[in-house]
Amino acid sequence: MTQPLDIDLPADHRRLALNILRAHLPQSIKAWVFGSRATRRARRYSDLDLAIDAGRRLTLDEIARLTEAFSDSDLPHRVDLVDWHDIDDRWRQTIMAERVALTEAAHPDAAG
């Protein structure tokens, strides 16, 4: 179950990640943090794991633009992107067990 935003990531880094997502993908996407930042076991330079659900599979161009934007950003850590529509059910279950909503659309009380 998705939890309220309680992740091991400073607010300015959250805003930066959201701004990058919004600049390259439709506003209606759902994005979740998972991994060590969602479980609050991150170390200083732990990567940021993001699962993205655009309602469809992301294009290679979208993934490339996002990867480049995150790489060129001021975030002090690597961002690993996972396309929700490009993973198997086992991987989805693993992510669902610890995910924390990053976007409003990903919150459990959001419409859709």
Identify the residue ranges that each predicted region occupies.
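Catalytic core of pol beta-like nucleotidyltransferases
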Residues: M1-K30, A38-R44, A54-G112
